[in-house]
Amino acid sequence: MILDIEMLRSFYASYSESVAQAKATVKRPLTYAEKVLFAHLFDPTQLRPYKRGVEYVDFRPNRVAMQDATAQMALLQFMNAGKDKVAVPASVHCDHLIRADVGATQDLPEACKTNKEVYDFLKSVSQKYHIGFWGPGAGIIHQVVLENYAFPGGMMVGTDSHTPNAGGLGMVAVGVGGADAVDVLTGQPWELKMPRLIGVHLTGKLSGWATPKDVILEILGILTVKGGTNAILEYFGEGLDSISTTGKATICNMGAELGATCSIFPFDQNASEYLRKTGREEIASLAQMNAAELRADDEVLADPSAFYDQIVEIDLSKVEPHLNGPFTPDAATPISHMKAKGPANDYPMVVEVGLVGSCTNSSYQDLARAASIARQAYEKGIEVKGQLIINPGSEQIRYTAERDGILDDFKKIGALIMTNACGPCIGQWKRHTDDNSRKNAIVTSFNRNFRRRADGNPNTFAFIGSPELTVALTIAGRLDFNPATDTLLDKEGNSVMLDAPTGFTFPPKGFAVEDKGFIAPSEENANVEVVISPDSNRLQKLAPFAPWDGKDLTDMPLLIKTEGKCTTDHISMAGPWLKFRGHLQNISDNLLMGAVNAFNGESNKVKNQLDGAYVEVSTAAKAYKAKGISSIVVAEDNYGEGSSREHAAMEPRFLNVKVILAKSFARIHETNLKKQGMLALTFCNKDDYNKVQEDDRISLTGLKEFAPDSKLTVTLKHKDGSEDSFEVEHTYNDTQIAWFKAGSALNFAAKK
């Protein structure tokens, strides 16, 4: 069954005409990303050549996807909007709350028991408001979306930063916070800064141990975690043909680690085949009828530098297997360099655990190719040194892989098969270790490797690679093992090599599944009652944030001056805290607990200016709030890098933090702060960061004249009585300033 088929038929009936109108209006050829963007303007009469990276534009996405950890807050906000049903097709996916422990057979029932209150809430809200519901065990949101919902030329938003995964099938798919999702769910315009365009020219063909994952790992080394901010990466070139749709999805998925708005590949024969193999023949045919406009125009491909803001050249034939890390996904290292780099940087060289899965690499093809390496270990008599853990991407993939013997290949080398869920990738991992603070190394096929993320241990050195390389390094038990050149010993002491990975792109017998775990939206469920217990510690109805009082912010104590990387994991930790994602008061206790205090180098230990004691960040914030005092956070570059979790914006707002002053922001987090009525400001001169002292009282003036492109003034009142003043800037437009004045975007929408 093709889901939402009437919406898809209507879309394709007008898509090519919309693109033609766009070309006629802007009077030039278009890139593929531009075609999709222009075809989704909220008001087509406003079509014009927008300034990339500068102007905000209103769009009308086709659909919304939400995962269970972020859906709670998004749907709590939606329930306050007074709507009878969602305005566009939407889905909820229960994948983040399932803890990986001993294996799927026991872990899934335990998760259903532990999270029953949340699952019941999400299921009832989905039924009441006409939202598709994918229950626990159904699969990871982005793999399920690719298999069932993604379509060439479409636009979607998702309350998860790896939503761009659907770009592998030709969508502009953007990760957003819950408040942005509510805009789309209620039929309002969805605002986005017109992205810059980075063209990635692929030539050659991957071979040997090189995989699509290595393509994006190499690009991360080139562009870094900030290089894609406010940009779409559009892939083109002859190299496209050799990469499968799921491989392209992997590349788009980790574009999120570049800070990119999204990434996109054009429609091609591989995409058509993927649609047909996943039971969507009609969509493949509709896309084929529009194929000329599901790619960049010929003139663009002939002279790409005239149409893209930046060009990145990648020769696939020269791509090597990579290991990126530790602690940041842009620390790119070809595996051939690890023998020198590892000891030079004092990396722990023994690989204790290898983890294959996540929304980035859990397709049938990923598992089939990884299994071809596992199979060699037992066929060639090689002792496996590390522990291997597998998370299939969906129930359809798990069922098919089990039927085809793929899971048996993993089990024969001692692998644990976990639930079709995120698990360790989002910190939902009960790691069995005698000391979860010791220095050690793990290798994953995941997307992020921030300190503490997988297992809570700050001394776990996590490296990211392909599923194939992950299995090879787990077998070898060494971080510096290069499967293309190095040998291993079999049980007789003979030197043997691992052959390059092989595996089918699609299952030869086709995909199969008994129960996908899906409950379709139905008009019959409109009278379903949604119950939230007032005594719940996991769910809490939202109260509106207070509007701006019309005054400047004066004498704010510094809550924390963070040093170095401060991701959304540092601001609102996941793992054991995921259970509170529907309860703002409770989850606010983790505010900035992972951030490093610039004045003492410690995490979650800041000075409470009211009594001079050093306490947890949330404790200090609550003390200020109890006295009616607003506070401020000061940070360095790319503040809020990482996931789309709006809790990282709602928590400081709830605890009366009014300002985040940073050297720069990650795109999604900056938007989330604006949506919640906070002030996200940047230093005009980054060196002014160094002027901020631990005991400062900080004032922000000029708010009565707050306007687009205006400057505000920060005054630091130091403990010794001296002062420093400097200007700060912002990216707020008129609408976003209205959100601030109303107290939040939701407050503003409610007044309209």
Language-model segments: which ranges?
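Mobile "lid/hinge" segments at catalytic clefts and subdomain interfaces of large enzymes
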Residues: L3-D4, D68, F151-A284, L416, ...
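Terminal amphipathic helices with adjacent charged low-complexity linkers/tails
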Residues: F42, Q46, K51-R60, A74, ...
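Short glycine/threonine-rich loop-to-helix capping motif typified by GTGT followed
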Residues: L47, E147, F151, I243-A249, ...
